[in-house]
């Protein structure tokens, strides 16, 4: 159980790291802190004493306690010797992330940088803890994959504080629009469009799309899905668009597909999946209904991960750059650090957008007519 003084200490540190209390800004008085955190004077003093000893705050006789300017504590020589990069991803050992990490580490280690890796599990609180660690330990730069990038983020102040402290960052796979950061990611609108167009070209008209909508990638892939239908003049069945959040990803898509397949009279002939991971899970549901892939149902994944060839049905999918993205992100953050660039405009020359490429395997085929022949 966390002690009261440590709780107060961590709360004050969080305000400093978030940029709520700026360097040389006054920390609340003892009485104010006692009231705010409902603790004793002894607890407040113990918390402040430790913060003073650790260089977070300083006292002025008769004036109070103030936030220390930690940028003043940075030794330029020491900074050159540190060469530490933080890498924050939503996941570490799952799916495409080991390949991205491997690509980044190969370049960073080649240039003498040490890499510390954090995972958020696509959770804002865990992202906050990772950013606090980055700001506390004074990394030279940060490569970060945003957390739940399509919804308002409570941690934007931490990124602004990184900028204030001169710590550059680049974002991969998605970005926070309000920050306009350097960004490396796929053209996900075109990716979703390409998935859908492939099925439409094969004669499929009843297509289900499943997209994770708390990440920007999912929102953009859905946009591409809708765009492809509009271009063909094919009206979408609203019940064939299934969206879900990170917390729902293991249940809702499967439950919704069960619901759709139970209605034999309006079964779809094609499915567009947010990623390969989802596609593989859906194959289990499809087997339950004795539906054959691709003879009766075509399925398209996204990312061309190792999972795309892990099943007996090899997935048609969209290729994700993975290792290449990691390499490019590492080169960009090194360039930002060594040239001390300040401009982080998202539409500047430093952002990299990768073109989606369709990898056709065995999970898609021409749609069959009611008589069982190709259209």
UniProtKB/Swiss-Prot annotation:
The entry's DNA-binding region: 30-49
GO molecular-function terms, A-Z: DNA-binding transcription factor activity; transcription cis-regulatory region binding
Gene3D superfamilies named in the record: 3.40.50.2300, Winged helix-like DNA-binding domain superfamily/Winged helix DNA-binding domain (1.10.10.10)
The keyword Cytoplasm is assigned to this record: yes
HTH gntR-type domain: residues covered: 1-70
SUPFAM superfamilies associated with the record: Periplasmic binding protein-like I, Winged helix' DNA-binding domain
Main location: cytoplasm
Subcellular localization: Cytoplasm
Function: Transcriptional repressor of the arabinose utilization genes.
Protein name, UniProt field: Arabinose metabolism transcriptional repressor
Taxonomic lineage: Bacteria, Bacillati, Bacillota, Bacilli, Bacillales
């Amino acid at each position: 159980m966390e002690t009261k003084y440590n709780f107060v200490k961590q709360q004050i540190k969080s305000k400093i790291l978030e940029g709520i209390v700026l360097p040389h800004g006054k920390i609340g008085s003892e009485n104010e802190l006692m009231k705010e955190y409902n603790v004793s004077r002894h607890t407040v003093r113990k918390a402040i004493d430790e913060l003073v000893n650790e260089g977070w705050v300083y006292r002025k006789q008769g004036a109070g306690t103030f936030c220390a300017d930690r940028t003043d504590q940075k030794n330029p020589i020491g900074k050159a010797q540190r060469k530490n990069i933080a890498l924050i991803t939503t996941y570490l050992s799952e799916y495409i992330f080991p390949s991205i990490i491997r690509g980044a580490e190969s370049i960073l280690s080649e240039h003498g940088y040490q890499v510390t890796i954090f995972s958020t599990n696509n959770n804002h609180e865990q992202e906050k803890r990772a950013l606090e660690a980055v700001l506390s330990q004074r990394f030279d730069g940060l490569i970060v994959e945003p957390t739940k990038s399509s919804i308002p983020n409570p941690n934007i102040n931490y990124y602004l504080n990184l900028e204030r402290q001169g710590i550059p960052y680049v974002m991969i796979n998605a970005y926070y629009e309000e920050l306009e950061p350097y960004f490396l990611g796929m053209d996900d609108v075109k990716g979703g469009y390409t998935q859908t167009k492939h099925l439409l070209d094969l004669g499929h008209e009843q297509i289900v799309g499943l997209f994770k909508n708390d990440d920007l990638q999912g929102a953009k892939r859905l946009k591409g899905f809708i765009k492809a239908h509009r271009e063909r003049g094919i009206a979408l069945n609203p019940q064939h668009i299934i969206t879900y959040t990170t917390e729902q990803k293991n249940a809702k898509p499967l439950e919704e597909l069960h619901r759709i397949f139970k209605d034999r009279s309006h079964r779809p002939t094609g499915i567009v999946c947010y990623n390969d991971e989802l596609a593989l899970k859906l194959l289990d549901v499809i087997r339950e209904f004795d539906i054959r892939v691709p003879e009766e149902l075509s399925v398209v994944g996204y990312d061309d991960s190792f999972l795309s060839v892990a099943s007996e049905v090899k997935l048609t999918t969209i290729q994700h750059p993975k290792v290449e993205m990691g390499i490019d992100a590492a080169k960009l953050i090194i360039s930002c650090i060594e040239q001390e660039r300040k401009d982080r405009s998202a539409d500047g020359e430093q952002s990299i957008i990768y073109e989606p490429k369709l990898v056709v395997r065995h999970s898609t085929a021409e749609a069959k007519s009611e008589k069982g022949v190709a259209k």
